[in-house]
Design a protein with these regions (language model features):
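Solvent-exposed alpha-helices and their adjacent loops that cap or buttress functional pockets
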Residues: 1-3, 43, 68-69
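Short secondary-structure boundary segments
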Residues: 32, 54-56, 80
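Acidic, metal-coordinating helix/loop segments flanking the phosphotransfer/catalytic sites
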Residues: 38-45
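Extended, charged amphipathic alpha-helical "stalk" segments
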Residues: 41, 56, 66-67
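Periplasmic-binding protein-like
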Residues: 49-53
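Glycine-rich nucleotide phosphate-binding loop and flanking beta-alpha elements
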Residues: 58-60
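C-terminal structural segments of small proteins and small subunits
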Residues: 64-86
């Protein structure tokens, strides 16, 4: 039985997610709420099991986060930015 391989992604503003690219995660820079929602939908369809999301971007999409909070996958984990914790 073959096991499924899942991916890890990082979504947020470009400056905040750059360090994650250096350690090998796939990064997805976004600039607005609509773009964040579209990226999350795409990543959830493309076998991303863990998505790190910057808190400043997460604050723009509370309804979308509430939806994904009820799903098994992907797990969305908020990460603070230089602006501090929400």
């Amino acid at each position: 039985m073959a096991s499924k391989t899942y991916k890890i992604g990082v979504v947020g503003n470009r400056d905040a997610i750059l360090p994650f690219r250096l350690i090998g995660f796939q990064t997805f820079p976004v600039t607005g709420a609509a773009e964040v929602v579209n990226v999350l939908r795409r990543l959830s369809r493309e076998d991303f099991a863990i998505i790190y999301l910057t808190e400043d971007v997460a604050a723009e999409i509370p309804e979308t986060l509430a939806y994904y909070d009820k799903q098994v996958l992907p797990a969305i984990i908020l990460i603070p930015t230089h602006k501090g914790i929400m």
